[in-house]
Regions:
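Consensus positions within tandem repeat domains that build extended binding/scaffold surfaces
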Residues: 115-117, 137-142, 160-163, 182-186, ...
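Short, T/G/N/S-enriched strand-turn elements that build extracellular solenoid repeat scaffolds
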Residues: 30-39, 55-65, 162, 194, ...
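A recurrent domain-boundary module in secreted/ectodomain proteins
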Residues: 503-521
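C-terminal tail/sorting-segment detector
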Residues: 1-3, 551-566
C-alpha cells in the first residue's frame, strides 16, 4: 500500500511539473518576483500576460537554457505562451555580446522581439508571440534547435536576418506583403513546407539554404534569387517564373536531389557556382537571353548529360563544366571567343567538340582528361593556348593546330596517347615543356621553319616516335630531354644544306640518322632585276615588313607571287 502511494505521488509530481505555469504581470520588470530562483529551472510550460521588458527577458532566457551573457544554464523551458503579453521598452539589457574592443548591450523596444532575444535557447520547442508584436529582430531565435512551432501574429510585418535560422520548424508561411530577409530560415533542415508571398521580387542570400524543402512555388513577381538562397536544400525541381532575371552565386549549389530546372526566356544572369554539385541534374537548356554564365556554374554536376549554351555568349567561364563526367553533348556558340581554365576538365564522356571560328584562347586545363574526345580541330582565329589545355585526352587521333599560334604551352597535349602524327603549323615559334610528352602512339612530328625553341621534355617518353621533320634552317634551341626516350631507329629530316648544322647542335645530334630533304614551293629570297616588291605576307596572310624571318609570301610588280623563306 505504501509503495503504491509513493509511485502515485511521483506520477502526480511529474504531471505537475509538465502542467502550465501561468503568470500575470501588472508592471514590467517584475517577473522575478513571480518566479523564484528555486522554480525557474523546474518550469517547462509557461504562460505570461502583461508587460515585459529587458529585465524579464533575462529571466526568460535563463529559463530557456541561456543566460544574459549567452552562457548555458540549467533551464528546461519548452513551451512559452506570450499571446497576452506585451513587450515594452526599458529594464536591463537582456543580452550582452562581448567581442573585440567593445561590448554590445541589447535592450527591449516597444512591440519588438529584439535582436538575438532567444539566441541558442536550446530547450524551447513551442513559442506563441504577443499579438501586438510588429517585428522579429535579427537572429532572434537563431540556433533554437528544438523550436518546432512558432505562432506569429498577423501584426508582424518584418522578420530579421537569420531570425529563425537553425530551428526545427517543419513548415512556414510568410504573410503577404512581407519581404524575405537574408538567411531567415538558413539551416532549417526539418523545414518541408514553405510558402513565399506572391509579391516578393527578391529572395536574398542564404534565405532557405540547408532546408528540407523539396518543392517550392516561386512567385510570378520574382526577379532575383540571391547568393546561396536554396543551396544544400532538398529541392527536386525548379520552375523559373517569366519575371526572373538573375540566379546569383551558388543559389542552387549542393542540392543533391535537384533533377530538373526549367529556365525562363527572360533570364539574363546565372552566377558563379549557381548549380554547382547538383549531382542529380540531367540537363541544362540555357536560354539565349542569358549573357552572363558564371564560373563553375555547373561544375561537379556528375550526372549532367546534355547542355545547350546560349547564342550570344562570348566567354565560357572558368570551371563552368569541370568534373561533369557524364556530359556527352554541348554546343559552343559561334559568338564565343574565350574558353576559360578548367571549363570542361574531366568530362569523361565528351567525345566531340566543335570550336567556332572567332575563338581566340583556350585556358589552363580547359579540356584536361576528356579521355573520350576523339578529335581536336582548332580554328584559324585561335592564337593562345594555356598550360595542359588538352592534357590526358587519351583517345584523340587527330589534332589540327591554328596557324595563329606562336607557342604551344607546357603540357598542352601530353598524354594524348592515341595520336600518331602531329603537324605543327608555320608561325609557331616555341614548343613548350612537355607539350607532347608521353604520347604513346606518336610516330611522326613535323616542326615548321618558324620554331626557334623546344623547351625541356617537349617530346619526351614517346617510345614510338621514329620520324621528325624540322624545317628550320637554323637548328632550334632545345631544352633538356627534349626528345628523350624515343624509338631507337629514329630519323631526323632537315632542310637541304643544313645537315652539318644539325649534326653539331645539342640534342639534334642525338638522332640515330639525319637526312636532308628537298623543300617544295619554297625559294631562297633572291633579287630580280626590273621587278620590285609590292607586298609581303606571313603564312597566316597578315601583312608584314621585310625585316621578318620565316616563311613569307611576296607579291611583285609584275603580278607574280613567290613563297620564300628568309
Amino acid at each position: 500500500m505504501t509503495k503504491l502511494f509513493f509511485t502515485t505521488a511521483l506520477a502526480m509530481s511529474a504531471l505537475c511539473l509538465q502542467a502550465q505555469t501561468v503568470v500575470s504581470l501588472d508592471k514590467a520588470g517584475t517577473l522575478s518576483e513571480k518566479i523564484s530562483s528555486a522554480e525557474k529551472y523546474e518550469i517547462t510550460n509557461l504562460k505570461i500576460s502583461g508587460p515585459l521588458n529587458g529585465t524579464d527577458f533575462i529571466l526568460l532566457r535563463d529559463m530557456a537554457g541561456m543566460d544574459q551573457e549567452n552562457n548555458k544554464s540549467n533551464g528546461t523551458l519548452e513551451t512559452l505562451d506570450l499571446t497576452d503579453a506585451s513587450i515594452v521598452k526599458g529594464g536591463e539589457p537582456y543580452y550582452v555580446s562581448y567581442g573585440g574592443n567593445a561590448d554590445t548591450e541589447y535592450y527591449t523596444s516597444d512591440n519588438e522581439m529584439g535582436h538575438a532575444m532567444f539566441i541558442k535557447c536550446a530547450t524551447l520547442k513551442d513559442v506563441k508571440l504577443p499579438t501586438t508584436v510588429t517585428a522579429i529582430g535579427d537572429s532572434c531565435f537563431l540556433e533554437c534547435k528544438a523550436l518546432s512551432n512558432l505562432d506569429i501574429p498577423a501584426s508582424v510585418k518584418e522578420i530579421g536576418s537569420y531570425a529563425l535560422s537553425y530551428t526545427a520548424l517543419e513548415k512556414f508561411s510568410f504573410p503577404e506583403g512581407m519581404a524575405i530577409t537574408e538567411g531567415v530560415l538558413y539551416g532549417c533542415s526539418s523545414l518541408a513546407s514553405l510558402t513565399i508571398p506572391s509579391d516578393v521580387t527578391v529572395i536574398p542570400r542564404d534565405a532557405f539554404s540547408g532546408t528540407g524543402i523539396q518543392e517550392i512555388e516561386l512567385p510570378k513577381s520574382l526577379t532575383k534569387i540571391g547568393e546561396e538562397a536554396f543551396s544544400a536544400s532538398l529541392i527536386t525541381k525548379v520552375n523559373c517564373p517569366e519575371s526572373l532575371l538573375t540566379i546569383d552565386t551558388g543559389a542552387f549549389s549542393l542540392c543533391p536531389n535537384l533533377t530538373e530546372v526549367n529556365f525562363n526566356n527572360k533570364l539574363e544572369t546565372i552566377g558563379n557556382r549557381a548549380f554547382s554539385s547538383c549531382e542529380s541534374l540531367l540537363e541544362a537548356n540555357i536560354p539565349n537571353t542569358v549573357t552572363t554564365l558564371g564560373s563553375s556554374a555547373f561544375s561537379t554536376c556528375s550526372r549532367l548529360k546534355k547542355v545547350h549554351l546560349p547564342e550570344g555568349l562570348t566567354k565560357i567561364e572558368t570551371a563552368l563544366f569541370d568534373r561533369c563526367d557524364k556530359l556527352e553533348e554541348v554546343n559552343i556558340p559561334e559568338t564565343v571567343t574565350s574558353i576559360g581554365a578548367l571549363a570542361f576538365q574531366n568530362n569523361g564522356k565528351l567525345s566531340s567538340v566543335t570550336f567556332p571560328e572567332g575563338l581566340k584562347d583556350i585556358g589552363k586545363n580547359a579540356f584536361k582528361s576528356c579521355y573520350t574526345l576523339e578529335e581536336i580541330i582548332l580554328p584559324q582565329s585561335l592564337d593562345s593556348l594555356d598550360v595542359s589545355c588538352f592534357d590526358g585526352c587519351m583517345n584523340v587521333v587527330n589534332i589540327v593546330l591554328s596557324p595563329a599560334l606562336k607557342k604551344i604551352p607546357r603540357g598542352a597535349f601530353s598524354y594524348c596517347s592515341s595520336i600518331e602524327k602531329i603537324d605543327i603549323p608555320e608561325g609557331v615559334e616555341v614548343i613548350g615543356e612537355m607539350a607532347f610528352a608521353s604520347c604513346d602512339e606518336l610516330r611522326t612530328v613535323k616542326i615548321p621553319s618558324t620554331v626557334t625553341t623546344l623547351e625541356k621534355a617537349c617530346f619526351c617518353d614517346n617510345w614510338e616516335l621514329v620520324e621528325v621533320h624540322c624545317a628550320a634552317l637554323t637548328p632550334p634551341t632545345c631544352g633538356k630531354n627534349a626528345f628523350a626516350d624515343m624509338a631507337e631507329e629514329n630519323v631526323l629530316y632537315v632542310p637541304s644544306g643544313t645537315k652539318q648544322a644539325y649534326e653539331t647542335a645539342d640534342t639534334w645530334s642525338d638522332f640515330a640518322s639525319i637526312v636532308e630533304e628537298e623543300t617544295t614551293d619554297i625559294k631562297k629570297n633572291t633579287v630580280r632585276s626590273n621587278v620590285y616588291e609590292t607586298a609581303r605576307y606571313n603564312i597566316a596572310g597578315q601583312s608584314i615588313g621585310n625585316d621578318r624571318n620565316g616563311i613569307q609570301i611576296i607579291k611583285y610588280s609584275d603580278g607574280t607571287s613567290v613563297k620564300t623563306v628568309k
